[in-house]
Amino acid sequence: MDDKFWEKINTYGENGEFDKIVREIKKLPEDKLDIEIINVLGRSYMNLGDYENALDTYLSYIGKDKEDVTNADIWLYSECGWLCNEVGDYEHGLKYLQEAEKLGRDDEWLNTEIGQCLGRLERYEEAKKRLEKSLKLIEADEEENGHDRVDEKLFICSELGNLYGV
């Protein structure tokens, strides 16, 4: 897409005019859609509180990215899982997160999301293992990159504390 399109989209976003973003993107022919546009469209739906259309937007693009379908699909499944978890649909959230994992994602964020989801599904032992794995991944990253990730560790520890308190 050209600079003029993105300037318009960014201005709408800065002004909180997410309905206008949706209208602009919906005008585009399907062959102009890419992962960046799908991301903006999905986020706009979320900002409007229209979670069903956000989810449908992400799911409709799975397998369609022209440049890097695997990484796009990993991101889309991750986003679908996060979205479902945010609205309390933990079964579907877990399913989508596991799809991202099957495609090769195995980082602290994914393991934390899966751990939270499992905890809310009362699968406590599995949840603890995932969250403990997240902590190990963060600690390895800290050693490798020399920066402290205290906030993330505190969040995960609080989730673990909730699970151990059950």
Residue spans of the language-model regions?
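Register position in tetratricopeptide repeats
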Residues: 14, 47, 83-86, 120, ...
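Start-of-helix register in tetratricopeptide repeats
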Residues: 3, 36, 71-75, 109, ...
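Short coil turns that delineate tetratricopeptide repeat
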Residues: 32-33, 66, 71, 105, ...
